[in-house]
UniProtKB/Swiss-Prot annotation:
This is ETS homologous factor. GO terms for cellular component: nucleus. Belongs to the ETS family. Keywords: DNA-binding, Nucleus, Transcription, Transcription regulation. It is found in: Nucleus. Residues 179-204 are annotated as: Disordered. Signal peptide: none annotated. One of its GO terms (molecular function) is DNA-binding transcription factor activity, RNA polymerase II-specific. GO terms for biological process: cell differentiation; regulation of transcription by RNA polymerase II. The PNT domain acts as a transcriptional activator. Transcriptional activator that may play a role in regulating epithelial cell differentiation and proliferation. May act as a repressor for a specific subset of ETS/AP-1-responsive genes, and as a modulator of the nuclear response to mitogen-activated protein kinase signaling cascades. Binds to DNA sequences containing the consensus nucleotide core sequence GGAA. Involved in regulation of TNFRSF10B/DR5 expression through Ets-binding sequences on the TNFRSF10B/DR5 promoter. Residues 185-195 have a biased composition (Basic and acidic residues). It comes from Bos taurus. The keyword Transcription applies.
Amino acid sequence: MILEGSGVMNLNPSNNLLHQQPTWTDSYSTCNVSSGFFGGQWHEIHPQYWTKYQVWEWLQHLLDTNQLDASCIPFQEFDVNGEHLCSMSLQEFTRAAGTAGQLLYSNLQHLKWNGQCSSDLFQSTHNVIVKTEQTDPSIMNTWKEENYLYDTNYGSTVDLLDSKTFCRAQISMTTTGHLPIAESPDTKKEQDHPTKPHTKKHNPRGTHLWEFIRDILLNPDKNPGLIKWEDRSEGIFRFLKSEAVAQLWGKKKNNSSMTYEKLSRAMRYYYKREILERVDGRRLVYKFGKNARGWRENEN
């Protein structure tokens, strides 16, 4: 690993490497490790000592950095602390998260054995950006086929998630044995002085659940009578045929067992990100949050 000012692990060569736990060197003493036991951020401490909340923060980080839909990772299957998480085998990850299990397992192994404190890991705006090599193509192909096939109602093109998405994060979905590489100084200079981003129009065939819901509202002629606006100006909408929406989403994601209960559970993960909100006291009624884009009438 190439990192500016990063530490390395001390491994006792007299023991079997597979049964060792990493020990943090003096270079990690500057991190506020103790705060991790009392609500610190997940990347500040070793995964072994994560709380249940920090485990969920880690899962949410993987969703955000890799631009995955919230339904890709079943959070309810990971209601465990870091000690339990680190003891889980690859088979247990696969049982809990399906095709995403191997990706989660690989990332956790990387953090366990190559972990850095946040001061070393997350300096994308001031220091070297760390990238990972491409995930095993066989894993990627399975992931793509099962999670990113578009329904024919949203176009005939099979739009698969580009494998580069998984390499976009600073420390992302890696398999053990892959070494991160550092960007060149020219790339670093561009990162320090980024160009002004261009506003993009929303994708009419959004891959995320909230975009899928938004697109039904914006194109009622394609799927009439499923969802309607309660107050367009405030972004409030109601499900009219909740199970039909769930089945359509399941068809889009190639998941025949999708129900509204599962769909609504996935929607909850957008609350923290302020993309969706639940309207209190009103069944099947939701509201777009401040971070949702593309639903307003005057929005380009």
